[in-house]
Amino acid sequence: MLLLAAAFLVAFVLLLYMVSPLISPKPLALPGAHVVVTGGSSGIGKCIAIECYKQGAFITLVARNEDKLLQAKKEIEMHSINDKQVVLCISVDVSQDYNQVENVIKQAQEKLGPVDMLVNCAGMAVSGKFEDLEVSTFERLMSINYLGSVYPSRAVITTMKERRVGRIVFVSSQAGQLGLFGFTAYSASKFAIRGLAEALQMEVKPYNVYITVAYPPDTDTPGFAEENRTKPLETRLISETTSVCKPEQVAKQIVKDAIQGNFNSSLGSDGYMLSALTCGMAPVTSITEGLQQVVTMGLFRTIALFYLGSFDSIVRRCMMQREKSENADKTA
């Protein structure tokens, strides 16, 4: 009886693996596709643009700094695979005025055709203890990280639905999967992206438009270097429990997942564990993905509890050291 049950289980799992590709999205062909990348003048955004360009895409780079845009354009053009490819640069703040963003997208589509893939990579990080952060910092991060993704997505979605094809990528962060000391403003803005993406995916899936939410770890970018300048000790020590990734690695994974239409995009074993742990009611791209989440949930939750204990220990040690230092100063 046990052998029969085991045989049935194995057959069922094999059937899932065979059927899964049949219900998964058809991969997006990048050769000749029009890819718009916001925040594309540096860091992960620039590397994503390069990765897409290597595969034959036409690129529209969107960022605020025109000089950085032109420099990024030169770097990207070095990776062309044919002489027909184009890199278009548009300088605009995607978080300030929706009408301006909409006009910019229209200009890009008039020159390079309908947008096949939008990558929302514009963003910034500011860390600090909750009571030390200015209220304006919370407003600024929500504007840049959240509305800066809403506006471009809203500008392309109608055309994508009409054409019955498209990909929209939201670049969140592992801090958009779990809240960490010092990230009360940043994490909130990145968690918001997850809610937007889940709701939007349910709306556009019948139109063959697929959403990808990327959760990159700490990545060696100019933005990360700037973030480290003001990072609290607790935040820095917690961050140092994992390694820093290269932007090229992150970009390759994001582009791969976006092409496949995967809802989640993560990197490494920690990223895989976090995505499985925090899947909740998020959509799955394949039956096997859902099965893996069900099977691994218990184990990953156990591991996560040890991580949380370690993080809490770091915070307590820092607090004790700070209080000891303050008491020493008072008695000096």
Swiss-Prot record:
Catalyzed reaction equations:
sphinganine + NADP(+) = 3-oxosphinganine + NADPH + H(+)
Q: Which CDD domains does the record match to this protein?
A: KDSR-like_SDR_c
Gene Ontology biological process terms from the UniProt entry: 3-keto-sphinganine metabolic process; sphingolipid biosynthetic process
Subcellular location as annotated: Endoplasmic reticulum membrane
Its membrane topology:
Multi-pass membrane protein
Q: What class of enzyme is it?
A: oxidoreductase
Tissue specificity is: Expressed in all tissues examined. Highest expression in placenta. High expression in lung, kidney, stomach and small intestine, low expression in heart, spleen and skeletal muscle. Weakly expressed in normal hematopoietic tissues. Higher expression in some T-cell malignancies and PHA-stimulated lymphocytes.
> Which residues does the entry place in the Cytoplasmic compartment?
26-270, 315-332
Motif mapping: GXSXG:
39-43
* Pfam families named in the record: adh_short
Topology, Lumenal side: 292-293
- UniProt-annotated catalytic positions: 172, 186, 190
Superkingdom assignment? Eukaryota
State the InterPro entries in the record: KDSR-like, NAD(P)-bd_dom_sf, Sc_DH/Rdtase_CS, SDR_fam
Which keywords does this Swiss-Prot/TrEMBL entry list?
A: Chromosomal rearrangement, Disease variant, Endoplasmic reticulum, Lipid metabolism, Membrane, NADP, Nucleotide-binding, Oxidoreductase, Palmoplantar keratoderma, Proto-oncogene, Signal, Sphingolipid metabolism, Transmembrane, Transmembrane helix
* UniProt record similarity statement: Belongs to the short-chain dehydrogenases/reductases (SDR) family.
Q: What miscellaneous comment appears in this entry?
A: Was identified as a potential cancer therapy target as its inhibition leads to proteotoxic stress in those cancer cells that overproduce its substrate 3-oxosphinganine.
What functional role does this protein have? Catalyzes the reduction of 3'-oxosphinganine (3-ketodihydrosphingosine/KDS) to sphinganine (dihydrosphingosine/DHS), the second step of de novo sphingolipid biosynthesis.
Oligomer and partners: Dimer or tetramer.
Q: What is this protein called?
A: 3-ketodihydrosphingosine reductase
Biological source species: Homo sapiens (Human)
